[in-house]
Amino acid sequence: MRGLSTKPVAIIIAILTVHFLFAAVTSQSSGDFVPIESKCNGTIAECSLSTAEEEFEMDSEINRRILATTKYISYGALRRNTVPCSRRGASYYNCRRGAQANPYSRGCSAITRCRR
């Protein structure tokens, strides 16, 4: 088995070099992959302050998803500095000792693989 000869490898390297040089010369970008226009025309300090304010004004995707799961806010959640139920694994709505957090209420079927 012979190794690769140097002539085809040199030709491939030359073609790739010419291709990349041609692409670099004809590109419209100034080094960025995606041209982005600046929205702020002030100083760096002014622009960074406006960006920080916008960051806290926008609601995060996670907050929107969490709030979208329920259509109401309970009175307990509106009280200040309180934990709804401090018992580990207990339901917020049923904080009694021994109460199940998520009681199983579906019937038994082959799909759920429950014991009979």
Curated annotation (Swiss-Prot):
Question: Its GO CC terms?
Answer: apoplast; plant-type cell wall; plasmodesma
Q: Where is this site: Required for proteolytic cleavage?
A: 64-65
Q: Which positions make up the signal peptide?
A: 1-23
Offer an example of a GO molecular function term for this protein: hormone activity
Q: How is it modified after translation?
A: Proteolytically cleaved, probably by S1P, a subtilisin-like serine protease (subtilase).
User: Which compartment or compartments is the protein found in?
Assistant: Secreted
Q: Which domain of life is it from?
A: Eukaryota
Task: Please give the residues the UniProt entry marks as glycosylated.
Answer: 41
Cysteines joined through disulfide linkages: 85-95, 108-114
Q: Which UniProt keywords apply?
A: Disulfide bond, Glycoprotein, Hormone, Secreted, Signal
Residues that make up the propeptide removed upon maturation:
24-67
Q: In which tissues is it expressed?
A: Expressed in roots, stems, leaves and plants.
Q: What GO biological process terms are annotated to this protein in UniProt? A: calcium-mediated signaling; cell-cell signaling; regulation of growth
Q: Tell me which PANTHER family the record gives.
A: PROTEIN RALF-LIKE 33-RELATED, RAPID ALKALINIZATION FACTOR-LIKE
Q: What does this protein do?
A: Cell signaling peptide that may regulate plant stress, growth, and development. Mediates a rapid alkalinization of extracellular space by mediating a transient increase in the cytoplasmic Ca(2+) concentration leading to a calcium-dependent signaling events through a cell surface receptor and a concomitant activation of some intracellular mitogen-activated protein kinases.
Tell me which family the UniProt entry assigns to this protein: Belongs to the plant rapid alkalinization factor (RALF) family.
Q: What is this protein called?
A: Protein RALF-like 33
Annotated organism of origin: Arabidopsis thaliana (Mouse-ear cress)
Organism placement in taxonomy: Eukaryota, Viridiplantae, Streptophyta, Embryophyta, Tracheophyta
GN (gene name): RALFL33
